[in-house]
Amino acid sequence: MKKYLLPISLIFIIGAFLLGFIQIDNVSSDKKGDDVINYGVEDIPDNLKTFANLSKRNEDIICAVSRGLVSKDIDNNILPSLAKEIIKSEDGIEYEFKIDDNIYWSDGSKITSDDVIVFFRELLKEDDEENIHALLDVYGAREFKDGKTTFEKGVAIKSKDNSVIIRLNAKNDKFLSELTKPQYRLRKYLVMWENIKKNYNEVIYSGDYKITSFMNDKITLESNSNDGNRRVINLINDSNVELSMASFEIGERDIVINPPQSQLNKLSNDGSLITMPKDTGVYLYINDKNNISLQGRREIYKYISESMEDYSSSNEKSFELAEGSYFRENKEDLTKLQTRKVISNKEEVWSPPKVLTILCRDNSINRELCRVIEKWFAENTDISIKYSLLKEDEFNDEELQKRYDMILINNEANILDKDKFYKKFVNYMSDSEKEILLSNNCNDDVYLNLENKIFEEYKIVPLIFYNENIAYSKKISNIKMDGNGNMDFSSIK
């Protein structure tokens, strides 16, 4: 009998051991089904310290794990975040941000005004000037950046009674809007974010989520909420949106940003798509130096507008026609639109060429538009379209650009930042237009006069505004973007 005891005991122990694994796996499966959101992204960056090379989807990671003094919703309303109240002086130069007393880091310690000031000092030292315009508008900030003064003595960012007090060099109506951008979200020990893959477990987080795992192909975020809803979000590197969508269709992804165009109608019919306007616009420069008359430029614009109109009839989820407006918001100005429509319909003699050429940056938007334009011209005119899609350094060759009849320009059509918007066109303007644009005297009237001129000359004309599309699974009942085009992780339910 004794000779059987040892084998029987071993079988019992091994069986109990395996049952333990089965139980653990069941728990893991339940959690995966109920609590985990899988978000497909095209790449995962190691460096989250500076913004020079981050895409909008890379920025989403920072938005998930950190909060700013203020935020901006999809309707461009400025909302409190770390600051519970904002007080602006009568002259518009000084701002007081009263920090909420009930906000905490991911380790449970309280977030204070001193934390914000330390972060702003680090941000001024570590990030590139082009990414921190809002802070460089602060009195003394540029001198500190250039090493001419200390932060404590020279920069007008101070702490008082758990408030952050900021004084600008001059009134800036865009200051709060700029401050909502992801780069100004509070990050502890900023230098450690340069290798966040290595340091993710050493830093603490000010946002709705914290990073709990960082691998080459996946980042795991866990909710900081204490309400019992410990939601987990996996950001999974799928290399391209087609791979994300394939995984979405078999239930392995719950969020896909801008799924393939061919899938949009099906997703919409299934109730699995949110479509929102975004600032990305496409504009057409028509080269007046290539012997194309005013009437020729007018006809080209008319033809290309018709090609976009035909295309939009089956792709209304992807974009909205500009219809003569440089900003989406201006489409409500019916008088202006009617005037521009009348101008566009003038007819004069023009002898069209056999071939027209288009140059543009090589991206998915431009590839699709060039294909559509080429096809429409072949079917509706006697003009052939030849186009070139080039990488950034090749595209920026000014001598090369002069040899093309048209150039597609992708621009951020943010009506709150007209200066940045119009300066994107500066290389395509006359010397007198450049002088106006590069002066410090631009206001809304100046921009409007400039806009009317380049439209009436058919030099730079608006074509379309793109939409943001989000595919989401049945696991999600609510999801939103913020006013900067980033994912609002606090909205996910």
Question: What function would you assign to each model-found segment?
Answer:
Residues 40-90, 121, 204:
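N-terminal lobe/hinge region of extracytoplasmic solute-binding protein
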Residues 41-62, 82, 109, 175-185, ...:
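A structural "hinge/loop" feature
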Residues 85-135, 292:
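Aromatic- and charge-enriched surface segment that lines or borders ligand/interaction sites
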Residues 133-190:
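Surface-exposed binding/hinge segments that line
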Residues 168-234:
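Gly/Pro-rich hinge or "lid" segments in bacterial periplasmic/extracellular proteins
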Residues 217-218, 223-266:
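Ligand-site clamp/hinge motif
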Residues 286-337, 369, 451-460:
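Periplasmic-binding protein-like
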Residues 311, 383-395, 409, 418-477, ...:
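Extracytoplasmic/peripheral linker and loop segments enriched in polar/acidic and small residues
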